[in-house]
Amino acid sequence: MAHAFFLGVDVTPADGDGAPDVTHTLFEKSTEGAGEPATYRLNRIRDHADVASADDLADHLQGLVADQPYIGRTSLIVNRGAAFGAALVGALEDRGLDPVAATLTDEGGATAGAPDEVGIHLGGGDVLRRFVNLHRDGRLRLENHATEAASRLARDVQALSERLDEIDGDMEALGETQTDGLSFDPGATHITSAALAVWLGSERSFDPSQRLKTSPQTDAGA
C-alpha cells in the first residue's frame, strides 16, 4: 500500500485589527495497489482563531511535520490570496518547507504560476467540485474524528454533495452539460483547506519530491 500526506492551509482576511481565521487540514492519500484509485483520509483538521503572526503559524506547522515522523515528507499548499496567506508562504519557504502557493480565482481551469515559483492559479469552483466529486465517489474518508472542526467539515461536504446532485439532475433534465453551479465561499476555511490538500494530492504521485504537473487538471479523475 502506498501512502502520501498533503496539508492544505486557508486564510480568511482579518477584520480591522483582529487576527485572521486560519484552518489547516491534513489528508493521507493511499492506494491498495497499482491501477487502483486513490482514497483520501482526513488525518486532522484544526481552526486557528488567534494566530499572532505568519511566523508563529509557520513554526506550528513546521513542528507538526517534525513531530510526526510518518508525515515528515508532507506536501503543503497554502491559499496566498490574503496578505497573511502570502506572508505564510514566505515564512514556510524560509523554514525549508517548500509550499505550493495557490491563488484562487472565479474563473475555471488551472494554470501554473511563474517559472521561478512553486505556484498555481486555480478556479475555486473547479477545486470545490473535484473535492465534492471524490466524496460522491466514496473516495474521501472523513469519519472517526471527534472534533467540531472535523464534524463541521463532514456535514458541509455532505450538504455540498447533495446540492451538486440537485444541480446535475437539473442539467440532465434540461439536456445540458453542467460546468459550474457550486458556490465557492471564501470564508469557509475548513472546506477550502481540505479541498486544496486533496487537489494537491490528486496532482502529485506518491513521490513527495515530485513537482506539480506541467498541465494541472481540475477534474476528479486522479
Segments (PLM) and residue ranges:
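Short alpha-helix plus adjacent loop in nuclease-associated cores
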Residues: 101-148
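RNase H-like, metal-dependent nuclease domains and their acidic two-metal-ion catalytic environment used
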Residues: 1-102, 140-222
